[in-house]
Amino acid sequence: MMERDIRAVLDGLGLLVEDSKDAGKLQAMRNYAAVMALCADLRKSAEEYRGTRNITMVISELENHMAAVAGLFPTWDLPKDQHLVGAHAAISKLTMGTCFGQPT
């Protein structure tokens, strides 16, 4: 995946997280499904770069926070806002210049 494609995926993930802020249960599930699809693309791209394990751990962190927002992890008793902050933090980590060989 080219740098601009990765940037577009990361921007899309940010929009989905932001859209989940006021989303109802059904929309949160749709957003989660879209996040999972985009994260699958990122995982494929991560295989091309060093630090694959670290990148996939951050991708999993994002997926887990969005699953909690969608209500799939009822045992996670953090407020929804904290999961959204965690998801944004994971995206911020992925946008760092050290990920995916992006320029700083």
Residue ranges of model-derived segments:
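Short, structured helix-loop boundary elements
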Residues: 3, 56-59, 81-84
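Intrinsic low-complexity, intrinsically disordered segments enriched in polar/basic residues
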Residues: 1-2, 58, 69, 104
